[in-house]
């Protein structure tokens, strides 16, 4: 299965095309736009990923947008909550068409990136981040293609 992983609408937009565990393409938007920490995807980046990997079978986005909007609502960030431009399904339609988008937890995205690029068959993983959807710190146990969350610290608590 060919998977296109996307991080956008935050800082450091990036994509990775993976097939059966092999990275076919990976790139950051700032390399294409020249804008440091660019949050927007651009057409050339996506075109390169499709040129190297073809059309993906699945598109995976790095966070769950409705949980993030709920956190923004609770934090009083009403402009962000009401904006549809920062919804991945709206933002990505020009890039991935009607492809179904699977949303995974922000901290699980970090955990997977660390685990799948490590040489270990099983691992404990600690993710400490300013904030994901609600989580600020998580501890995972991973083996094979399984991830089990063992601990979670939630917003507004953070290290």
Residue positions per predicted region:
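Short acidic/glycine-rich loops and adjacent helix/strand connectors
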Residues: 1-159
């Amino acid at each position: 299965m060919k998977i296109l992983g996307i991080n956008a609408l935050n800082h450091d937009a990036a994509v990775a095309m993976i097939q059966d565990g092999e990275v076919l393409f990976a790139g950051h938007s700032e390399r294409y736009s020249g804008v440091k920490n660019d949050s927007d995807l651009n057409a050339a980046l996506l075109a390169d990923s499709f040129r190297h990997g073809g059309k993906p079978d699945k598109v995976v986005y790095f966070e769950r947008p409705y949980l993030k909007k709920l956190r923004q609502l609770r934090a009083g960030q009403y402009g962000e909550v009401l904006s549809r431009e920062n919804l991945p399904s709206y933002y990505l339609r020009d890039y991935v068409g009607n492809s179904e988008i699977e949303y995974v937890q922000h901290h699980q995205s970090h955990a997977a990136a660390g685990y799948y690029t490590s040489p270990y068959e099983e691992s404990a993983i600690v993710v400490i981040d300013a904030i994901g959807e609600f989580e600020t710190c998580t501890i995972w146990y991973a083996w094979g293609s399984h991830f089990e969350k063992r601990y979670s610290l939630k917003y507004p608590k953070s290290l």
